[in-house]
Amino acid sequence: MMPIKSIVTLDQLEDSEYLFRIVSTVLPHLCLDYKVCDQLKTTFVHPFDVFLNNSLGSVTKQDELQATISKLGINYLIDTTSRELKLFNVTLNAGNIDIINHPINISSETNPIINTHSFYDLPPFTQHLLNIRLTDTEYRARFIGGYIKPDGSDSMDVLAEKKYPDLNFDNTYLFNILYKDVINAPIKEFKAKIVNGVLSRQDFDNLIGVRQYITAQDQPRFDITYNIADAARHYGVNLNTLPLPNVDLTTMPTYKHLIMYEQYFVDDYDRVPIYYNGNRVIFNDEIINFTISMRYQSLIPRLVDFFPDIPVNNNIVLHTRDPQNAAVNVTVALPNVQFVDINRNNKFFINFFNLLAKEQRSTAIKVTKSMFWDGIDYEEYKSKTLQDMMFINSTCYVFGLYNHNNTTYCSILSDIISAEKTPIRVCLLPRVVGGKTVTNLISETLKSISSITIREFPRKDKSIMHIGLSETGFMRFFQLLRLMADKPHETAIKEVVMAYVGIKLGDKGSPYYIRKESYQDFIYLLFASMGFKVTTRRSIMGSNNISIISIRPRVTKQYIVTTLMKTSCSKNEAEKLITSAFDLLNFMVSVSDFRDYQSYRQYRNYCPRYFYAGSPEGEETIICDSEPISILDRIDTRGIFSAYTINEMMDTDIFSPENKAFKNNLSRFIESGDITGEDIFCAMPYNILDRIITNAGTCTVSIGDMLDNITTQSDCNMTNEITDMINASLKNTISKDNNMLVSQALDSVANRSKQTIGDLRQSSCKMALLFKNLATSIYTIERIFNAKVCDDVKASMLEKYKAFTDISMSLYKDLIAMENLKAMLYIIRRSGCRIDDAQITTDDLVKSYSLIRPKILSMINYYNEMSRGYFEHMKKNLNMTDGDSVSFDDE
């Protein structure tokens, strides 16, 4: 017996091998009407991976990705300016993301469950995030991954020993940091952006504001570094006439640029002295505490919420020196003003105040629940059906959140259960293959299989299989083609056409149809003898042998005319030759006709378009031929007969030849980066298709409840509206699109109604003839024999006619109601559901007729008008004394 640890599981496979296992083992056990949850059709990708490769973002929710980018920008700025965190192992520079190789400062409280998975199929930053998540605490992983808590209560508050500031607002921090076109300055934190070849106006204004506080000795170096002179000329600013800087804290119009100097430039450029009320301030820390407190006064309470231990006072002491250099300590106390001491951690708190200010004037980010971060409750996961469990575990990485020592960790769900821990939430990461999530590919594949119709199998060959010659003429022409060789292209075309015309003139008999087995050989010989470049490629698609014949240049009528004119033929002569050889030319031009777009899309990949330098005739004619593979060629007979034991026979892939071709096709689809579920379906061999079940066998539909839902609208007089309502009534149990099915069923009822109304009209006419004869007899008695027939007799006869028409119409309604119920049952059965009604009642018949009545209303009105006409005609001939005593009433 094989050891359990040596069994290969799906999470250990990648690319085509993984997708093949999914399609061949998981897909056949899903019903065709299986619904894939919309939340599982997208996945999570780290924004850094998306920045490096935009195509990776196609498998994510765009609103969720944008929210993560905003949150990640905030967390990155907090992390890089902090002295303690340093959780990110990257440095974001202009246009690139540099990975830091030194160990990351992560928590010493590592996950007690050891992670043994590598996740090599994931992009690098997503893979790294996942490794951090399964190693460190869940809280730190969420900080690095840009997690945002969703609206609502269906999420988990993770436990952690220490938490970091959680700010949430729309921003473009990451885009600004990664902006490519910036000035290459030694100070990397400040990005001086270049727009249209010149320093941006916003950055220019900020740099000019900072420049006024830089000493005169350092200003030239500052100007050269940031191309201040060029930008000043561009914006019409004269640097020599700039006003003198205001360096007194009591009269400064703004503290913004002084704070910017402290944030970015303090280590590279010297600053001019700063004064308070004419006295020079001695200590830089007091200057920054004063300026930042004054500029962000309204945000100090918000700062205290995040950092309760930060010192906040109602005054600040500035150590200054007066003009005589005497020490003067100034205590600044202003009404309703607080002063914060940022503890010499200037860059972090300046950055954090900027974040708080941005938060104050921005909108908060709102997101929905993330299957990757929030997941679902473990009890909800356990309550899922076996089908759902199988699908989720085979198409997604499945993680679990659990608590240990008052800390929340994340691990592979199976590892948590093996470690006898209790999961709280189950998080899912759908896998990606070929640029699409596997969950979405499976959904598309099921839809493609479900939407196929019986008419598509087998597909009849619509190609023209003759060239207008009898069998004798065709054999003569075939022999002549074999003699054509090594002649110029134009000459060869002319000689072949003329040879055909010569044989055609004396040919008699019905056209000889080319046999299928000889078709490809004749095609190759015909075009090669004319000097075309003919190449053949063969492959396997599904359970069919595919032959692709490429003919260059492309064969068209205009090309043949032009080529004949190059061989000294006038245009009239060329037209006459083409007219005489119409059947041959029609055969040549039509061989590449495609009536199935998907087949063309698939087959075209086997024969890529060629490019010709300077040639206008670069396109080619593609001929595709498909032949089913024989059952013996589909089976691995050698593997079966070489097996000596039951285990060896069980391990043999019986359909190895076509499965191997299927893997190769999947690999090619994945490499193209444009794989779809329809691609997989077209390449799927019959041995897999034959094993797919049509329905799960658990969906039941009540015909009465369904009719109740459908007949809630009384104005449904169009087929499309009825179709929509039927689909809506079935939407809770099936996922297939039944529009075509419903339309066909209702149209069949309408056609049946037309036939039945014809039968009803004929029977009514025959019965009306009896009443007409009876009315004629009464008329004769009264007019010829002058005997009076009382009105009661006449009224009785008319009432009997009315009863006859009512019974006929009632029978007609019952018949149509039954036909409509048959159509409903057909729709339900074809949709993969069962009927759970014990019996169909009279009320169901009434509902059924009410549903179809708008479609047959014109026929009902026709029958009523016809019956009314007979009634009024008889009533007129009866000449009743009281004509109003009886009347014809319809519905």
UniProtKB/Swiss-Prot annotation:
One of its GO terms (molecular function) is structural molecule activity. The record marks G614, S615, G697, T698 as: Cleavage. The keyword Manganese does not apply. Keywords: Virion. Pfam families: Pox_P4A. The keyword Acyltransferase does not apply. GO terms for cellular component: virion component. Belongs to the orthopxvirus protein OPG136 family. Core protein 4a is the most abundant virion protein. Major component of the virion core that undergoes proteolytic processing during the immature virion (IV) to mature virion (MV) transition. This is Major core protein OPG136 precursor. It comes from Monkeypox virus.
